[in-house]
Swiss-Prot record:
One of its GO terms (molecular function) is magnesium ion binding. InterPro entries: 4-PPantetheinyl_Trfase_dom (IPR008278), 4-PPantetheinyl_Trfase_dom_sf (IPR037143), ACPS (IPR002582), Ppantetheine-prot_Trfase_dom (IPR004568). It comes from Geobacter sulfurreducens (strain ATCC 51573 / DSM 12127 / PCA). Keywords: Cytoplasm, Fatty acid biosynthesis, Fatty acid metabolism, Lipid biosynthesis, Lipid metabolism, Magnesium, Metal-binding, Transferase. SUPFAM superfamilies: 4'-phosphopantetheinyl transferase. GO terms for cellular component: cytoplasm. The gene is acpS. Transfers the 4'-phosphopantetheine moiety from coenzyme A to a Ser of acyl-carrier-protein. Its cofactor is Mg(2+). It is an enzyme of class 2 (transferase). This is Holo-[acyl-carrier-protein] synthase. The lineage of its organism: Bacteria, Pseudomonadati, Thermodesulfobacteriota, Desulfuromonadia, Geobacterales. Its main location: cytoplasm. Its EC number is 2.7.8.7. It is found in: Cytoplasm.
Length: 126
């Protein structure tokens, strides 16, 4: 049964500026080391950062809340399976929230076109 859905759209040019400025402290606050390594290895890293940020926002919207009760941006991580499909990996407070809500699966879809990155998250429970 679907528990919640969330969608977020991000202007990639915001992340273009952040990458150009080398705003490492902000990236370290928003992304896990694994996410930063993945994005930095891409030709247009700002696009990949924007997609991951949109996915984190979409997850919070699907849950019906924002960052609170000690949850951090690192608690929601975007990883790729062996075929390259994006998945959400939950840690800390996000994992506890998923357990408390009896979530059984998370689905994430990422896309980009021109200056925009979009993420859709669907949360399911039994």
């Amino acid at each position: 049964m679907i528990f919640g859905t969330g969608i977020d759209i991000v202007d990639i040019t915001r992340f273009d500026r952040l990458v150009e400025e080398g705003n490492v402290r902000l990236f370290e606050r928003l992304f896990t080391p694994h996410e930063m390594e993945y994005c930095a290895g891409k030709a247009r890293s700002s696009q990949h950062y924007a997609l991951r940020f949109a996915a984190k926002e979409a997850f919070l919207k699907a849950c019906g809340l924002g960052l609170r009760e000690g949850m951090t941006w690192h608690d929601v991580e975007v990883v790729n399976d062996t075929l390259g499909k994006p998945e959400l990996k939950l840690h800390g407070k996000a994992l506890k929230l998923a357990t408390d809500l009896s979530l059984s699966r998370t689905f994430v879809s990422l896309s980009h076109d021109g200056a925009y990155a979009v993420a859709l998250v669907v949360l399911e429970r039994p």
